[in-house]
Amino acid sequence: MLRVRCLRGGSRGAEAVHYIGSRLGRTLTGWVQRTFQSTQAATASSRNSFAADDKATEPLPKDCPVSSYNEWDPLEEVIVGRAENARVPPFTIEVKANTYEKYWPFYQKHGGHYFPKDHLKKAVTEIEEMCNILKMEGVTVRRPDPIDWSLKYKTPDFESTGLYSAMPRDILIVVGNEIIEAPMAWRSRFFEYRAYRSIIKDYFHRGAKWTTAPKPTMADELYDRDYPIHSVEDRHKLAAQGKFVTTEFEPCFDAADFIRAGKDIFAQRSQVTNYLGIEWMRRHLAPDYRVHIISFKDPNPMHIDATFNIIGPGTVLSNPDRPCHQIDLFKKAGWTIITPPTPIIPDDHPLWMSSKWLSMNVLMLDEKRVMVDANEVPTQKMFEKLGITTIKVNIRNANSLGGGFHCWTCDVRRRGTLQSYLD
């Protein structure tokens, strides 16, 4: 519009056009030059910043807050779970396949509601005492955020309420200076990772590597909807045939189905961990680590650490009720195979999600110190004969929620180096 009006004004209009154009040109030219110079400076600054960031993201091992290669090096920092707000999971097919028949009425009645409050209160007290003892032993203790697990959530494939943040071992595994979030397989545990994000982000900001495995959809195809469960005999037959409630529709695994011995990590195919999940871990950790699949005579495999618990270099507790099919692999490597004593937990004590063999689900503070249940005297004597000092803590009520000391913890930092114990 300005140019049209000026042209109508004759020669003065033309001069005005020339004047305005020249001024506008000089203004634009100056602006472009300044912008270009500013962009160059910003780019140079960004390059320097990125270079600095590159240097900052690879800390020396001694500076990284996350560093653990096995189950027995001196423990410096650990995450301990919470019993607060724990809910009974809805009685879905994957829960049914992982629990014993005598507890099915409990799940049918209480699914989606709190665990018995008195029992939960005792469990909270026990875990607080466990944390205090760990601190007295010189270990830094971190705790997940409190979460309201009663909230119902819905995805395009399912809806559920939550479970708890009691067992960090189930969802987190530390390999070197990397912390890996497992995808899980129970729908009630889909959002369990949220309780740990504050801690993990802190580790990440301080230099740790952080990986989240592919999150499964947990659609119906992940589960064998017709999985036949009628008796222990049925479970034995199915396990022997390699049949589980989870299919190979997509990768899934719980971190507790893996146990570490330096460069070698042992995993089992279970009700919550499929071969695709193990393969994802194998590819992700190669070539620095070797993932081996081992199996057991177990009618209900779920989490390896109450069946096969490595307590030192070349030393493993092997459950006599669930013998390892590949035990010769360890014998040939010169390992010491220890058979733990029969647990003495009373028959009437509720174990809604686990077996009595939580007695061997111990936490090594180092090669010469172990955290063991105060009630399990035979297990204590076994360790004492091995020259290992027992740190006795009562977590009998906490056991009812599905785990022992190893399950209730995730060792974040142990003082040690990457070695091979199988060659």
UniProtKB/Swiss-Prot annotation:
Keyword entries, A-Z: Acetylation, Membrane, Mitochondrion, Mitochondrion inner membrane, Phosphoprotein, Transferase, Transit peptide
GO molecular function list: amidinotransferase activity; glycine amidinotransferase activity
Record PTM N6-acetyllysine, positions in chain: K385
Record field: catalytic activity: L-arginine + glycine = guanidinoacetate + L-ornithine; 4-aminobutanoate + L-arginine = 4-guanidinobutanoate + L-ornithine; beta-alanine + L-arginine = 3-guanidinopropanoate + L-ornithine; taurine + L-arginine = taurocyamine + L-ornithine
Summary of subunit composition and partner proteins: Homodimer.
Role description: Transamidinase that catalyzes the transfer of the amidino group of L-arginine onto the amino moiety of acceptor metabolites such as glycine, beta-alanine, gamma-aminobutyric acid (GABA) and taurine yielding the corresponding guanidine derivatives. Catalyzes the rate-limiting step of creatine biosynthesis, namely the transfer of the amidino group from L-arginine to glycine to generate guanidinoacetate, which is then methylated by GAMT to form creatine. Provides creatine as a source for ATP generation in tissues with high energy demands, in particular skeletal muscle, heart and brain.
UniProt-recorded name of the protein: Glycine amidinotransferase, mitochondrial
Species the sequence originates in: Macaca fascicularis (Crab-eating macaque)
Highest classification ranks of the organism: Eukaryota, Metazoa, Chordata, Craniata, Vertebrata
